[in-house]
Amino acid sequence: MSQVVDSLDTARDAAARQSWRASYDAFSSLERSALTPADFELFGDAAWWTGKLEDAIKQRERAYAGFSAAGDKLGAARVALTLSWDHEGRAAYAVSQGWFATAVRLLEGLPESLEHGRVVLTQAMTALMAEGDLPKAIELFDRAIELGKRIGDRDLQVLALSGKARTLIMSGDVEQGLALHDEASAAAVCGELKPFSTGLVYCMTISSCHDVGDIRRAAEWTEAANRWCDEADVSGFPGTCRLHRAEIMRMRGDWPAAELQAVAACEELRDFDRHITAGGYYEVGEIRRRRGDFVGAEEAYATANEWGKIPQPGLGLLRLAEGKVDSALAGITHALDEVDKPVLRLRALPALVEVAMAAGDLKVARAAAEELEAIVDSYKIGGRRTPAFDAVVHVARGRIELAGKDFDDAARSFRRAREEWQRVGAPYETAHARLLLGLALRRRGDEQGATVELEGALAAFERLGAKLDSERAQELLGRVQTRRTFVFTDIVDSTKLLDTLGDEKWRKLLARHDELVRGRILESGGEVVKKTGDGFFASFENPRAAVEAAVAIQRALGDEIVAPDVRIGAHTGEAFRTGADSSDFGGQGVHLAARIGAAASAGEILFSRDTLEGAGTGFRLSEPRAETLKGFAEPVEVVSIDWR
C-alpha cells in the first residue's frame, strides 16, 4: 500500500512541478482503482503535454465520469470543456460541440467561476474564427476579461486579451491590436500564466504579427516562445513553436534548418491540431519550392490539402515555375474566390499579380495590385506600412510598370522593394527584387547598373540554394546556355487566304487561330516566346511536351468549321536568352527549329530526328527524310508525326 501511495505522490508532485514526463510515467505505473477523478484529470494533462492525445482523452473521460458520479458538477464541467477543446483541435466538431453543450448545462445555476469564463472565451473564439462576427467577438472577449478580473484569474484575463487583440487587428485596428498582444505576451514572458495559456498567447501574437507583415515583431516573439518551449518539459506546443521558428528561418534564408523544423513540427502536431498541421505541411512545400525541389513541394502541398488547407498561393507559383500558366492562374483565382477576409486575400494577391502577368492578363494583374495596396494601407502601423508589406506592394506595382514600359518608375519600385526587404532581413526576397530591378534597368538602357543587380541576385540565390532562380539570373547575365525544345507554327498561304476572305473575316479567323494555338502551348506547359507574323515561336522544357502541344494544335484546328492550314516544326538544342528583358531566345538551336518549320507542309508536324530519339511520344512517326535547310551545310534528318 505504501508503494502505491509513494507512486501516487510522485505522480502528483511531478504534475505540480510541470515535470510532465515523470508524472505520466508515474501515473501509468498505477492501478486505475487507485486514482481519484482529480488524478485522472492530472493524468490526462500529463499525457497531453507529452504528446499522447488519445491517452489524454481517455484519462479525461475517466475524470469526467468520476466527477459526474461524485456529483461534482464544476469538476465535470471543467473536464468537459477541456475535452471540447481536444476534439476541436482534431476537427471532430460534432463531438466538440457535444462536450461544450454538456459543460454549459452543468454550469447552470453554479456560482461564477473560471469555467464560466472558459465558456465565454470559447464563444468568443467561435464568433471570431467560425462566424466571422468581429463585433460579437470583441463583446465576448471583453466580458471574459471582466469576469477574469472579478474572480482574480490572470490566465482568463490574458487569454481574452489576446483574443481581443487578434479581433481588433482583423477589424483593421492594427496598432491597438498589436499593443494588446505585446501586453499579453509580456505576461507570458514573466511566467504569470499556466503552460497552456502561455503557449496559446504566444501563438496568437506571432500569427497576428505575420498577418500584418510585422516580421520584426514576429521574430522577437518567436524567439521568446522558443525559449519557453526549449525550457518546458512538454510536447504539442513545441510543435507550434517549431513551426513559427521554421517560418522565421525560411525568411532569414536558412532553408535546410527551416525544413527540418517544419517537418518535426508536423510530426508533433498531427495528433493535436489538424489546422496547424496542415499549415506545417504547407510551410514545408514553400521551403522546397524555393529550393527547386518541385517533386517534394508537390508532395507537401498535397499533404497540406489532405489535412484541410488549400495550398495556395504556393501551388500556383509551383505551377508557374513548371510553365503551367493557365493552371497557376486558375488555382490562385479559385482560392481567392473562396475567401473574403482581407488578411487571407492579402496572402494570395501578390502571387496573382505575378501569374496574371505571365498569362498576359494585365487587367487582372492591375486589379490585384490595386486591391493589394488598399489592404496593405488598411494595416498601417504608426501611419506607415510595415517594411514587408511595403516591399510586396512595390514589387506588384513594379511588375505593372515594367509591362507598361514605364521603366523609370519600375526601377524605382523595385529599388524600394529591395531596400525594404533588406530592412526585414529577408535575403531571398531581396535577391528577387534585385533581379527584377536588373530587368528594369536593362530595359531602361542601364546595362552596367543591371549587371550589378543581377550579379548581386545571383550570389544570393547561390548562397541560399535557390537552384532555378540561380539559373534564371545566370541566363539574364548571358553566362549559360539553356537546352529547350523550340517550336515554330505558321499559317500556310496566309496572303492568299486574306485575299479570299477579306479583312474582317480574316481578322476573326486569325483571332480564333491565335486563341487556339496559344492555349494549347500553355496547356502543355510551354512558353509563348513571341508572335512571328501569323504564327508562334514557343519553347518547352522537353520534347514530349512539345509533341503534345503540336498535336493538340492540329487537332483543335481540325475541329473548327473553318480554320487555316498550319505547319509546325521543332528542334531541341542549346540557346541563349536575348532581348532587352531576356524574354527571347537566340542561337543555332532556334535557327534550326525555324528552318524545320519552314520545310513542313500544310497540316504537317515536323521534328528533327535527334529531338525525338528516346522521347517516347506515343504517336506514329514517318520514316526519316533528309532535308537541305537554308543556312546549314549538311542535310538534317527529320520525321513527320501522324497526329490524326
Per-region residue spans from a language model:
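Amphipathic alpha-helical regulatory segments at dimerization interfaces
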Residues: 29, 358, 463, 476-479, ...
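Catalytic beta-strand-to-alpha-helix segment of the class III nucleotidyl cyclase homology domain
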Residues: 537-644
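Catalytic NTP-binding/metal-coordinating core of nucleotidyl cyclase/transferase enzymes
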Residues: 478-551, 556
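Hydrophobic or amphipathic alpha-helical targeting/insertion segments
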Residues: 75-87, 91-102, 116
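Helix-coil-helix junctions within alpha-helical repeat/solenoid scaffolds
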Residues: 2-7, 11-24, 28, 37-40, ...
